[in-house]
């Protein structure tokens, strides 16, 4: 006599399970939707930080689930697939940390551990502040602006400063190189003629090297430097 227990979930049981946990599922899906839709550094930085934490948790979760699949495979084919996927997840997770530490060594910014990108922009102001910001790729042109005495770049609030504080060169760092952008144009003043309230700067990609940014003490104006 076969004493093996059938663990297959029936339709009625599945429906009952969904009825019991549908509120949790709804809240979880709403949470993910809010993170994905509003989790941008240019919109809401609190939600963006939560999004980064969730993304950081996904790799260990994938590795853990993959390890469980290797221990309890459905069949031989499933075991092979589980091993391949788990190894891929482990290598990807290790690669992320290697690249992040290389980028951190180059730019000295916690933005280096941003799982969404592999680059960090950096503006070393002449008043001693270092303003770092998230950037998805290495562009050909950067256009920081000053509005009401506040510096913005790529839509992100960086620090309070004046037009004279902007340097000749700014940088975008990647794990293997430092991209240098040189100022080619500067526009100051608004309709009232106040040159400290509004300014636009145009920086064009000038050169590429393998140097590192000098460690500059920040004035604490930005939580993200």
UniProtKB/Swiss-Prot annotation:
Transmembrane segments: 21-41, 52-72, 78-98
Species annotation: Avian infectious bronchitis virus (strain 6/82) (IBV)
Protein name per its UniProtKB record: Membrane protein
Function: Component of the viral envelope that plays a central role in virus morphogenesis and assembly via its interactions with other viral proteins.
PROSITE patterns in UniProt: COV_M
Regions of this protein lying in the Virion surface compartment: 1-20, 73-77
Keyword Membrane carried by entry: yes
Membrane topology of this protein: Multi-pass membrane protein
GO CC aspect terms: host cell Golgi membrane; membrane; viral envelope; virion membrane
GO MF annotation list: structural constituent of virion
Residue numbers on the Intravirion membrane side: 42-51, 99-225
Quaternary structure annotation from Swiss-Prot or TrEMBL: Homomultimer. Interacts with envelope E protein in the budding compartment of the host cell, which is located between endoplasmic reticulum and the Golgi complex. Forms a complex with HE and S proteins. Interacts with nucleocapsid N protein. This interaction probably participates in RNA packaging into the virus.
Keyword Hydrolase: no
Coiled-coil regions listed: none
Keywords associated with the record: Glycoprotein, Host Golgi apparatus, Host membrane, Membrane, Transmembrane, Transmembrane helix, Viral envelope protein, Viral matrix protein, Virion
Protein location: Virion membrane; Host Golgi apparatus membrane
Annotated family: Belongs to the gammacoronaviruses M protein family.
């Amino acid at each position: 006599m076969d004493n093996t227990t059938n663990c297959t979930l029936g339709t009625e049981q599945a429906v009952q399970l969904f009825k019991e946990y549908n509120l949790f599922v709804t809240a979880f899906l709403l949470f993910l939707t809010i993170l994905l839709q509003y989790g941008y550094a240019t919109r809401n930085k609190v939600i963006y930080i939560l999004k980064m934490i969730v993304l950081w948790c996904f790799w260990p979760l994938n590795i853990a689930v993959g390890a469980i699949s290797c221990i309890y495979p459905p069949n031989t084919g499933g075991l092979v697939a589980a091993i391949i996927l788990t190894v891929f997840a482990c290598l990807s997770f290790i690669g992320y940390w290697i690249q992040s530490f290389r980028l951190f060594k180059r730019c000295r910014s916690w933005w280096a551990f941003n799982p969404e990108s592999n680059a960090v922009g950096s503006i070393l102001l002449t008043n001693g502040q270092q303003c770092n910001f998230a950037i998805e790729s290495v562009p050909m042109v950067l256009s920081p602006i000053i509005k009401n005495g506040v510096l913005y770049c790529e839509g992100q609030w960086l620090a309070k400063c004046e037009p004279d504080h902007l340097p000749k060169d700014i940088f975008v760092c990647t794990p293997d190189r430092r991209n240098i952008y040189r100022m080619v144009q500067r526009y100051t003043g608004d309709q009232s003629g106040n040159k400290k309230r509004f300014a636009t700067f145009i920086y064009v990609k000038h050169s590429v090297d393998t140097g590192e940014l000098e460690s500059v003490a920040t004035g604490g104006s930005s939580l993200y430097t």
